[in-house]
Amino acid sequence: LQSVSALTETYEDVKRDLETKLVLIAVQDDIPVGSVRLEIRDDHTAYLSRFGVRTTNQNSGIGKSIMHLADRLMLKHGVKQIHLHTCSTVFSLIRFYYGRGFYIDSTDKSRGYVRALLIKDYDRTPVLDTKIF
């Protein structure tokens, strides 16, 4: 199993992403509890990475709120399709993303595990204009 890139990021890697990507951070009681990074590309697609919610705050709606805000921002920026990779054998992750309108496009084992490419087409999946928080 190759190393998980999120665990080997350097300060410079994080700094570069903060400067070049859209980074959303959920804060509760002045403590960061969730975040996501979004790279908007010239071809009207985006790549979602480093999405996570603090373990003690999972299943509280924070992840759904982050994803809903990400959807609204992607539409505002003219994004037609968003992509992400995740481990395809973790049912809770796949279920979460399916619930947000993603589907599995393909899988590979290039990183030592079954990694799924998930896609969400905004033309096919409406984003409900509901309250974010």
Locations of the language-model features?
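A conserved beta-turn-beta hairpin within the catalytic core of GNAT-like acetyltransferases
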Residues: 40-49, 58, 77-80, 110-114
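Hydrophobic beta-strand residues of extracellular immunoglobulin-like
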Residues: 22-25, 116
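Conserved beta-strand-loop-alpha-helix junction that forms the acyl-donor binding cleft
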Residues: 83-94, 109-115
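Conserved acetyl-CoA-binding loop-helix of GNAT-fold acetyltransferases
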Residues: 53, 59-72, 95-99
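Conserved GNAT acetyl-CoA-binding A-motif
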Residues: 67, 74-86
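Conserved beta-strand in the GNAT
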Residues: 25, 31-39, 47-52
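Conserved GNAT-fold acetyl-CoA-binding loop/helix
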Residues: 1-16
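Terminal substrate-recognition subdomain of acyl/acetyltransferases
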Residues: 113-133
